[in-house]
A protein has these predicted regions:
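Bacterial extracytoplasmic/cell-wall-associated proteins, especially those involved in peptidoglycan
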Residues: 24-145
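Bacterial N-terminal signal peptides that target proteins for export
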Residues: 1-8
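Bacterial N-terminal signal peptides
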Residues: 10-18
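Intrinsically disordered, low-complexity Ser/Thr/Pro-rich tracts
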Residues: 1, 17-23
Length: 145
């Protein structure tokens, strides 16, 4: 009986260990980071999907630009608008389905503005404007290059 319990324990352990030992894939980490950043900017308010895509597109443009860090994580943490001023804020974010959907669409190559020069989103005018979106609560946000 004791041997049977040990065998069952080892069998269960062998089934659990491989999944626990596998690290998160880089693509999954990038998806999670992008969804969190999109949600940090748009999750509190019901912005349209186009707005979510534009926010994410700016982040991906920054990663591709020589003016910014080379990784999504570094770009996000370099700007308080995404990670917040409070330590642990960004880590505690749980993106909603719409943020994940926007991240998935962007990582699959979809673009709304389709202009790699667009590196800023702000209510103030910074350079040329590629796209402006209006929300009655937040006003006009411009996506600039």
């Amino acid at each position: 009986m004791r041997r049977l319990r040990i065998l069952i324990f080892l069998l269960i352990l062998s089934l659990l260990l491989p999944t626990a030992a596998i690290a998160q894939e880089p693509e999954d980490e990038e998806r999670e980071l992008l969804a969190k950043a999109i949600y940090a900017c748009t999750g509190i308010v019901s912005f349209c999907d186009e707005w979510r895509l534009c926010i994410g597109e700016v982040l991906l443009n920054r990663v591709a630009s020589p003016e910014f860090p080379d990784s999504l994580e570094e770009v996000i943490y370099a700007d308080e608008r995404y990670c917040g001023k409070v330590e642990g804020y960004f880590a505690a974010i749980t993106p909603d389905k719409r943020a994940y959907a926007a991240a998935d669409r962007l990582l699959a190559g979809e673009r709304v503005m389709n202009d790699p020069r667009v590196l800023w989103q702000d209510e103030h005018l910074d350079g040329g404007v590629c796209k402006s979106l209006y929300d009655y609560r937040w006003g006009t946000i411009r996506f600039c290059y």
